[in-house]
Amino acid sequence: MTEKVFLSIGSNLDPEKNIDQVKIYLDRAFKVSYSSIYKTPAEGFSGEDFLNLVCSFETSMDPLELRGFLKEIEEKMGRTIDQKGMSSRVIDLDLILYGNLIAKTEQLDIPSED
């Protein structure tokens, strides 16, 4: 069984390059539809503007497996443990929706409140 998922994607460190790169990773694994890219100012800290977009695709991965896959991509792209909270990011991939699933646990927050 597959589920339709939605991700948010953001970067403010060399964002054009990093968004292009994350699209390559995602396109290798899924048939992805992307929104337009939009710019937002950094909030809660002093930093460069973010480039953001949303994407959707169908997956047979369960939510925890997909979350792990997304974390692997972030790590491959150079995201480090100190790039959390309100800080600059090489790449930020957030699972916004996973089908009709509602999960509020330590591992999952779906639908995402971010």
Which residues does each PLM region occupy?
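Extreme N-terminal starter segment of soluble prokaryotic enzymes
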Residues: T2-F6
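Short beta-strand-to-loop capping motifs
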Residues: I9-S11, C55-M61, L97-N100
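Glycine-/small-residue-rich active-site loops that bind phosphorylated ligands and cofactors
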Residues: D14
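Short, surface-exposed acidic-centric catalytic microdomains
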Residues: K17, Q21-P63
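Flexible, gly/pro- and Lys/Arg-enriched active-site loops
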Residues: S35, A42-L51, L64-R67, E72-D114
